[in-house]
Amino acid sequence: MHLENGPLTKEYVMQFINEAYKQGFDRIQILDHTHRFKEFEVIYQGVKDASDYQKEWLANKKMKFKDSLSSYVRLINEVKSEKTPIEVLFGLEVCYVPEYKDEIERILEPYQFDFLVGAIHSIDGLLYDMPWSKEILWDKYNVDDIYRRYYELIFDLVKSNLFTQLAHPDTIKMFSYYPSYDLKPTYHELAQLLVEHHVKGECNTGCYYRYHHPDKGLSKELLDIFKEHHVDIITASDAHKPEDVGTCIKDIYKLCRYD
C-alpha cells in the first residue's frame, strides 16, 4: 500500500489501516516509492536523461522528491508507538538501478525498515509502464530484447542482496507485449535465485485493476513455477489510495497458497 498520493501523516496512514481492518486483514505492509524522497533523486538521473517526457514527470516537485526519509521515519515511529487494530509493517519500494547499487546501499544503511522491496521500472532508463512508454520503448525496440534485458535486471536485483521482496516480477507484460521466445527457462532461473537469496516474490493485483491486464496477478505459468520451486510468495493489492486496499487479494490468495 503506497502513501504517495497523500501526506506523510498518521491520519492518512490510519485510513489504510482502518480499511484493511474492515476487510479482515490482520497484517499489512505500507511503503512508498523512492521517487518520493529527496535522498534518492540521484539514482533517477538516467531516467531523466533518457527522455524529455520522463524529465518533465520527475520535475513535478509536488509529487517527486518532495519529502525526506527522516520525515518518513518519524511517521513510522509515531504510528508504531500507538496501538493499531492490525499489525502494520513499513518499508520502501526501491527503483533498482545497477550502476547506483552502492549509492542505494549507502542511502539505506542508516535505516531499519521492516522490509525492502526491489523493483525494476525501466529498461536502462526507459520506463516501460507509462503513457509515453509505447513511443519511447515498445514501438522503438525489439520486444524480445526488452524482455531479456528486463529479466537480466531482475536477476541483478535479486543477487544484490539489498532486498527482502521482489516487486511485480512480470509487470513487463502490462501493455500485453510478449516475446517470441519461451519464458519458462527464465522463470525457473528467477525462482531459483529468489529461493537462494531468500527474497519473496510478489503476486500483485495492480496490473489487473489499475491497468486492465487480464491476469489478476502473476501469470499462471510464472506462479506455477514459483510454487514448483517453493518461492515464498507474498500478495499485494498495490493500493495507491485507501479505497483500493485489498482489491482482488482474496482472488489471488487462494492461488498463491501452498496446500
Segment roles from a protein language model:
Residues 10, 35, 96-98, 111, ...:
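Divalent metal-binding pocket/active-site signature
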Residues 68-71, 149, 214-218:
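Short secondary-structure boundary/capping elements
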Residues 1, 13-16, 156, 161-162, ...:
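Charged catalytic cores and adjacent phosphate/nucleic-acid-binding surfaces used
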Residues 23, 82-83, 110-111, 160, ...:
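Alpha-helix C-cap/termination motif
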Residues 1-98, 103, 175, 181, ...:
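An N-terminally biased module of ancient metal coordination in phosphate/nucleic-acid-related enzymes
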Residues 46-49, 108, 134-135, 184, ...:
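Short, hinge-like loop/turn segments at secondary-structure boundaries
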Residues 27, 87-91, 114-117, 164-165, ...:
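Structural preference for beta-strand elements that scaffold enzyme active sites
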Residues 73-78, 103-106, 152-157, 190:
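Short, charged beta->alpha transition segments
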